[in-house]
Amino acid sequence: MIYLSNLIPLNEYSKFRLNIPSDIKNIHKLFKKNKKKLFVVGGAVRDAILGKNPKDFDLATDAKPDEVLKIAKNGGLKTVEVGKQFGVVIVGGHEIATFRKDIGKGRRPSSVDYTDIEGDVKRRDLTINALFYDMDRGEIVDLVGGIEDLKKKKIRTVGNAAERFDEDPLRKMRALRFQGALGGKLGRETENALRQNPSLDGVSKERIRDEFVKSIKKAKNTKKYLQLADELGFTKQILPRYQISIPYINENDYILFLAW
């Protein structure tokens, strides 16, 4: 576990400020009262470390879905059970996911097994997205070296890269998106897995389109992002009807890619 006091020296992480919304703080108080843990996880923690102001907050807990519902009900909070079978309950407009292992492939697992934080982190895609902020103790829990990877702008999967990508092939495009957004590099195993199997088979056209648009918008250098995507074999899958020489595209003309 990495305590915030270790992040305070004047370096690129000294600006860490995770400004948690008041409604989430209230939810946290209810969980703490019931002796259950509540963590902020993923993108919000990553962005705060980078000095950005997070817009979305994903929450994770050791409480089972029925326990989450009971805590919320006793606290007078509105709940939605739309993802209960997958370990996700919406409380006060915020998704709260129980620590779990996903059984099956794809965006929606066939079933889940509940676990602890060590088990939960193994199902996540990239190390930089597998950071937890413990609201009880004011500490970042980093079990996979995500902070060091952020420091190096290194994009690396959690565990075996081929297995993570096989679970959901869209993760391949996500890895490339974060590489482009950070202006960083792919980890060796992660890059090798992408080169060996860039296939996006089984992923809907809509998900591919949305991820591609997001990648284009967030890339620090659009041309370099497109060059790498082409080199790894993604553009011919994303835009199969277009015969375009990627290296000669002006990065300001990427809108042409979105009209498909």
What are these regions (language model features)?
Residues 2-260:
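Catalytic cores of the polymerase beta-like nucleotidyltransferase superfamily
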